Every structure is written in structure tokens, then in C-alpha cells.
Amino acid sequence: MAKKPTQNFETTLQELESIVNHLEAGDLPLEQALTEFETAIKLVQQGQQRLQQAEQRIQILLNKDEQAELADYE
């Protein structure tokens, strides 16, 4: 099975919200609800990973900024 390319955070969040709405409606057959739930769990994991990556990038940028030498601006 081909692996689905990683979505951006916003798309992942939109898809997750859609699944939650379907599950909350309560009109899905059990097997479909379980499949949707499984997909939602994977999306949550992807979202968490994207947030962790963003947090790491921010930390790197802040650390670089703290180590930079101050210079007069002309």
C-alpha cells in the first residue's frame, strides 16, 4: 500500500474535525466508525508530530538568537 504524503497541519486538523463530526453524529455503522476512529488517531499523531517539529524549530531559532552578538545598527 502506498503511503499517503504528509499533510500540512491545517489540512490534518480539518480532516480530524470532519471525522469527529461524523463520529459525534452517531449514524455510522460500527465498522465504519472504528475505521474513522483509527484514521482520527493517526491524524492526531501526525498533528502532534508537526507541532513538535514546529516547537523544535522555534527553540533552535531562539537559541541562535540568544547566541548572536549584539552590534550597533547604522
UniProtKB/Swiss-Prot annotation:
Gene Ontology MF: a single term: exodeoxyribonuclease VII activity
Stored InterPro entries: Exonuc_VII_S, Exonuc_VII_ssu_sf
Compartments in which it is found: Cytoplasm
Major location category of this protein: cytoplasm
EC number in record: 3.1.11.6
GO cellular component, one term: exodeoxyribonuclease VII complex
Keywords: Cytoplasm, Exonuclease, Hydrolase, Nuclease
Source organism, top-level taxon: Bacteria
Catalytic reaction annotation: Exonucleolytic cleavage in either 5'- to 3'- or 3'- to 5'-direction to yield nucleoside 5'-phosphates
GO biological process: DNA catabolic process
Annotated HAMAP family: Exonuc_7_S
Role according to the record: Bidirectionally degrades single-stranded DNA into large acid-insoluble oligonucleotides, which are then degraded further into small acid-soluble oligonucleotides.
Subunit-level organization: Heterooligomer composed of large and small subunits.
PANTHER family from the UniProt entry: EXODEOXYRIBONUCLEASE 7 SMALL SUBUNIT
NCBIfam families attached to this UniProt entry: PRK00977.1-1 (NF002137), PRK00977.1-4 (NF002140), xseB (TIGR01280)
Family designation: Belongs to the XseB family.
Name this polypeptide is given: Exodeoxyribonuclease 7 small subunit
